[in-house]
């Protein structure tokens, strides 16, 4: 009860500190509209530069993507004797002149680097010094692009703008701290929408390189920022590395929010681990041992069962990691014929019970006479 109360308090606190990303709006500034209209088309992997002055306070570029992928922007920060390296702000507008992304590189480094996942299309990238002490200083910059069909698509900070996610795919995204920013378009959260089937077993995975992050998988009725875990369909909320049974067929949302730290790369996925019957490939006899090979399938792990009887009476069982497709059985009796089979399994939790096992059917049976 104390844990649930604590989680409730944290959720309320986060609801006050987490700024829910705003819907993107068309450029309402005539200056921005004119800048977009005159932005110069830039090529990837080409060096460019801009010298800041009272007349040049912003740098605008137009880029065109023929496919989905990750755009990387490298910029050298202007240096001031008093302030040191001056932070750079970056905004991205889509072809409809809507701002979809804002980020400030506030690292105490000479270079500013921003990575962002974008869909195919035309974009306008604007960056500028965070302070007005950069006159006469030059910023060198370059755009690069890596095609990636399994990446975030900004802006994806709400349910309505969530990046579509397929099960059993690792998605790449970038998240960074925007604490204190008043921009409506800051990268406050990344949201992915994935469709799951009731009764199937899944594992939610999130692997950040670094950073202080809230990463949850929510049902379609749960408020973002909720922390208390639940497997109920109306309150569904689980954290990374959770294996669960989907309580309904429909859309679920992977929600990622970073409230501290520099921009970092992460991987997120929802994998179907419902056990499926594996195929046993071979059983090779060794010296008082046998090496078993099978075809990998879905599941959190495998069980290899062996016996001196074809009906598997008095059988022994060994557990094997889901990453393996082979196992060595030791301490067998010489000149004896052993029968072997394998199955996959998944271990999951529910609202009422933990560590529930679900098994697939047993594979075909093979035998070998031990040396």
Q: Where do the PLM segments sit?
A:
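Sec-dependent N-terminal signal peptides of Gram-positive bacterial secreted proteins and lipoproteins
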Residues: 2-24
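Short, flexible loop/turn segments at beta-strand junctions in immunoglobulin-like
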Residues: 115-118, 196, 244-246, 329-333
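Short S/T/G- and acidic-enriched coil/turn segments that sit immediately N-terminal to beta-strands
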Residues: 323-327
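Beta-strand-rich modules
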Residues: 332-350
């Amino acid at each position: 009860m104390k844990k649930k109360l604590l989680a409730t308090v944290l959720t309320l606190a986060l609801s006050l500190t987490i700024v829910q990303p705003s819907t993107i709006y068309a450029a309402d500034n005539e200056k921005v509209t004119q800048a977009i209209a005159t932005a110069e088309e830039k090529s990837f992997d080409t060096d460019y530069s801009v010298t800041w002055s009272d007349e040049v306070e912003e740098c605008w570029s137009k880029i065109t993507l023929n496919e989905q992928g990750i755009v990387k922007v490298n910029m050298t920060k202007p240096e001031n004797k008093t302030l040191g390296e001056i932070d750079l702000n970056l905004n991205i507008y889509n072809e409809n002149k809507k701002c979809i992304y804002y980020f400030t590189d506030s690292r105490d480094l000479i270079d500013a680097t921003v990575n962002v996942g974008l869909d195919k299309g035309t974009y306008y990238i604007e960056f500028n010094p965070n302070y007005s002490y950069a006159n006469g200083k030059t910023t060198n910059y370059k755009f690069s692009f890596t095609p990636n069909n399994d990446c975030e698509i900004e802006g994806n900070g709400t349910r309505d703008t969530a990046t579509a996610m397929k099960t059993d795919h690792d998605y790449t995204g970038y998240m960074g701290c925007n604490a204190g920013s008043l921009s409506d378009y800051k990268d406050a959260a990344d949201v992915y929408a994935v469709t799951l089937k009731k009764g199937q077993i899944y594992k939610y995975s999130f692997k950040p390189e670094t950073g202080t992050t809230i990463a949850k998988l929510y049902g379609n009725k749960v408020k973002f920022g909720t922390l208390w875990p639940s497997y109920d369909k109306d309150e569904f909320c689980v954290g990374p590395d959770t294996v669960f049974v989907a309580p309904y067929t429909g859309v679920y949302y992977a929600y990622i929010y970073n409230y501290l730290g520099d921009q970092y790369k992460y991987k997120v996925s929802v994998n179907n681990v419902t056990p499926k019957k594996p195929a046993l490939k071979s059983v090779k006899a060794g010296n008082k041992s046998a090496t078993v090979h099978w075809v990998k399938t879905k599941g959190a792990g495998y069980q290899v069962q062996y016996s001196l009887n074809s009906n598997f009476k008095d059988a022994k069982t060994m557990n094997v990691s889901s990453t393996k497709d082979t196992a060595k059985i030791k301490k067998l009796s010489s000149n004896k014929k052993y029968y072997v089979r394998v199955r996959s399994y998944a271990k999951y939790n529910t609202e009422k019970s933990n560590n529930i096992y679900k098994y697939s059917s047993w594979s075909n049976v093979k035998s070998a006479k031990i040396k």
